[in-house]
């Protein structure tokens, strides 16, 4: 049995997509994964990533956001 813990829920203002981040922990131990669930109307996109990929993705998102006009 795996344990799923909700970390954050967001809604994109332009497209209305629902984004949920979840931590996935496996009973046998090992590496936890970050599950990203994106719901767009009745369609779901779900993928699991490792901590290193999550860190690189997060840094890329922050770099992009920091380069955008504020206001």
Per-segment meaning from a language model:
Residues 1-71:
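Positively charged, low-complexity terminal tracts
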């Amino acid at each position: 049995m795996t344990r799923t813990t909700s970390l954050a829920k967001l809604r994109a203002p332009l497209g209305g997509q629902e984004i949920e981040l979840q931590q996935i922990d496996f009973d046998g131990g090992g590496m936890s994964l970050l599950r990203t669930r994106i719901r767009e109307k009745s369609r779901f996109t779900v993928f699991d990533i490792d901590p290193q990929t999550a860190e690189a993705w997060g840094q890329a998102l922050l770099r992009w956001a920091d380069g955008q006009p504020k206001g």
